[in-house]
From Swiss-Prot:
Name this polypeptide is given: Appendage-associated protein
Subcellular localization(s) per the UniProt record: Secreted
GO function terms (MF aspect): actin filament binding
Main localization of the protein described in the UniProt heading: secreted
GO aspect biological process, one term: biological process involved in interaction with host
Length: 364
């Protein structure tokens, strides 16, 4: 027989079990009394009742244990909640106070703004009144100072004008002659511009007359002194050529060694530059020349091997790793010893020699 209570283990369930157990005990006592009165009842019924009572007691014990455990857990949870509440109570209070203050600020924002604006207006009005009072108090002083500065400025301007006028008069007295001369020059330039053609014609006519007279005089002088002038010119030319020859010989004698050294130096420099260029060309073309020579040598060896193969004297057991130069040389020597040819082919011998001897061109 199961427990007639719910699985929740609530306090109401424990009370119901206790009441059922009490009713069961009362019924059992009544039945026991009835059995004793009736002369002994059914024993099996009593056993069932006892089993039901035990099951009810077990259920009650479990419910009580659950109730005790729940009470302990509830007490521990209450302690933890109290500790958390004690720890976070200031923060919660501060946050709630902040929210209240924000709400108050939001509610009174317009009033605060209006109050600030009104205070600023009042302050500006008071400041304006103070400034007006200061202006009213200092206005005569300010007017007097302004008039004084104006008079000083006018006096300074008048003084500067007087000084400038005196300087201009001094400059005028100093440069009056220059100005008059310049004006006269301008007038003369204007007159020259008007009479320029006449002046040019007169100047040209005078120049022509002078040239004609000079030409006549020079012709007369030339006719008179022409033999002497020719003789003197020839004499001067001879003397100049002799002196020039002596100077050139002396210069050649002095600079001959330097010229020879310069020539030798230029030759050496040219050789050095040529050697550098040749070395640069060798360094640039050496790999290509070596590659071309190796290709030509390989081609020559191939042709020699083909020719020997055609003659049937080529070792057919040679492999790609075999020394092809030695094979070709041995085949040529065998042919020469056998007397099949008068002498080894110059082409094959030359090819073998070229391949066997490293190329000395360009230092390869």
């Amino acid at each position: 027989m199961g427990c007639p209570v719910s699985r929740g283990g609530s306090p109401g369930c424990g009370r119901r079990i206790a009441e059922e157990l009490r009713f069961f005990v009362v019924d059992r006592e009544a039945s026991m009394c009835g059995d004793s009165c009736n002369g002994g009842g059914d024993r099996q019924q009593r056993q069932e009742l006892a089993a039901a009572a035990r099951a009810s007691l077990l259920c009650l014990g479990g419910v009580m244990q659950q109730h005790i455990t729940a009470a302990k857990a509830r007490a521990e949870l209450r302690k933890e909640l109290d500790a958390i509440d004690a720890e976070w109570r200031p923060v919660i209070a501060r946050e709630s106070l902040r929210k209240e203050l924000k709400a108050i600020d939001a509610q009174w924002q317009h009033a605060i703004t209006f109050l600030r604006i009104s205070r600023a207006i009042v302050v500006s009005i008071e400041l304006s009144k103070e400034l007006k009072a200061i202006d009213a108090g200092w206005e005569p002083v300010i007017i007097h100072e302004a008039q004084k500065k104006k008079r000083e400025r006018e006096e300074r301007v008048a003084q500067v004008r007087r000084e400038l006028r005196a300087e201009l008069r001094a400059i005028d007295a100093e440069w009056r002659l220059v100005i008059a001369r310049e004006s006269l020059r301008k007038e003369l330039d204007a007159i020259d511009a008007e009479c320029r053609h006449t002046i040019k014609l007169r100047s040209a006519l005078r120049a022509i007359e002078g040239r004609m007279e000079l030409s006549k005089e020079l012709k007369a002088i030339d006719a008179e002194w022409r033999p002497a002038i020719r003789l003197e010119s020839a004499y001067r030319a001879i003397i100049g050529s002799i002196e020039l020859s002596k100077e050139l010989k002396a210069i050649d004698a002095e600079t001959q060694h330097a010229v020879e050294l310069r020539r030798a130096l230029r030759t050496i420099e040219g050789r050095i530059e040529l050697s550098r260029e040749l070395k640069a060309i060798d360094a640039e073309w050496a790999p290509r020349i070596a590659q071309a020579e190796l290709a030509a040598a390989a081609d020559a060896l191939k042709r020699a091997a083909d020719k020997l193969q055609a003659l049937g004297k080529m070792d057919t057991t040679s492999t790609p790793g075999t020394d092809l130069i030695g094979v070709v040389t041995t085949a040529i020597a065998t042919l020469a010893a056998a007397g099949m040819q008068p002498a080894p082919s110059t082409a094959l011998t030359g090819v073998a020699a070229e391949v066997a001897t490293p190329s000395t061109a360009l230092g390869v």
